[in-house]
Design a protein with these regions (language model features):
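Conserved pre-motif C helix in the palm subdomain of viral-like polymerases
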Residues: 2-37, 80-81, 165, 192-196, ...
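Active-site palm subdomain of RNA-directed nucleic acid polymerases
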Residues: 17-70
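Inter-domain linker/hinge segments that demarcate the starts of reverse transcriptase
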Residues: 71-96, 175-179
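Short, conserved micro-motifs composed of acidic
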Residues: 98-151
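Basic, alpha-helical interaction scaffolds
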Residues: 133-217, 235, 266-274
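Extended C-terminal regions of large enzymes
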Residues: 223, 236-274
């Protein structure tokens, strides 16, 4: 019979995961190159080999001080990253786990500067060789997918890329917002239920990634328009109600809907304070 873990939904799952993963992460800190940062005076140092959330793990690598003062060979970056990833695979394997290499990917953030000093990210097609990792005791090597720095990847629900481009994230939010609007229009919800759906479903879906997003105000107001107009009709208002009334406080005769452009700023500020 196969030995199975406690499962993600069990009450003992978090404790079991902590007991298993803590020594693995401590070993990763000692064996991997990791990533290091310093403050401008170089009096404070921060080092991290990997960041983990449940069963999702991200590893990072750099040689901060040395690469500040000399040209960086991207092949060295790739080799350090390959080494750190293989270390994590070995740790998982020896502890009874398995890294699913088909789901792994990596970015190489390598800057190029023109004669005017303008920086651009090197395309992934120029960043060779590709990383290959072994899995378990099979002796076989798998090529890991390399993503271009402008290509977003979903991380814990947020679509992010090293270039900080938000096009894919906005596109995904637009799909969710338009789907909500269609469902509200075609539903048989009461006014109270439509009101609750706006705040408990749509609003929470939209603001989840706001602490780490930087969408323009114009984009966010265009994004929220279909859902807001559909909800207004369901709760008995005109879809062309003035914005001052839609987003105004109830104490002053407003409907108290939330402007996503304002909420993004609030969420970012709260994250900084925390």
């Amino acid at each position: 019979e196969h030995i199975k873990g406690p499962g993600k939904g069990s009450t003992r799952g978090p404790a079991g995961c902590t007991i298993m993963c803590t020594p693995l992460l401590e070993a990763q800190e000692k064996l991997a190159h990791g990533i290091t940062f310093y403050n401008p005076s170089q009096q404070r140092r921060y080092h991290l080999a990997s960041a983990m959330f449940v069963d999702d793990n991200s590893t990072y690598t750099n040689k901060f001080l040395r690469w500040l003062n000399c040209a960086v060979d991207h092949t060295e970056v790739i080799e350090h990253l390959r080494h750190d990833a293989q270390v994590w695979e070995r740790l998982l394997w020896t502890s009874g786990g398995l890294l699913k290499l088909q789901k792994c990917l990596y970015y190489v953030v390598h800057w190029q500067f023109d004669l005017e000093g303008r920086a651009t990210l090197t395309p992934s097609s120029e960043l060779l060789p590709h990383i290959q990792l072994s899995s378990g005791n099979s002796g076989n090597y798998n090529t890991i997918s390399q993503y271009d720095c402008h290509l977003a990847h979903r991380t814990l629900g947020a679509w992010l890329s090293p270039s900080l481009c938000m096009k894919e994230a906005l596109r995904r939010l637009t799909i969710i917002a338009n789907l909500f609007a269609r469902r509200i229009v075609t539903s048989s919800l009461t006014r109270w239920e439509a009101w609750m759906a706006y705040f408990s479903v749509f609003f929470l879906q939209m603001k989840y990634t706001f602490p780490i997003s930087h969408h323009s105000s114009t984009s966010l107001r265009r994004l929220q328009s279909p859902a807001v107009r559909a909800t207004l009709v369901k709760i008995g208002f005109s879809r062309n109600t003035p914005l001052a009334v839609i987003y105004g406080p109830i104490d002053f005769g407003g409907i108290a809907f939330r402007d996503l452009a304002v909420e993004q700023g609030i969420e970012q500020l709260c994250m900084i304070i925390r």
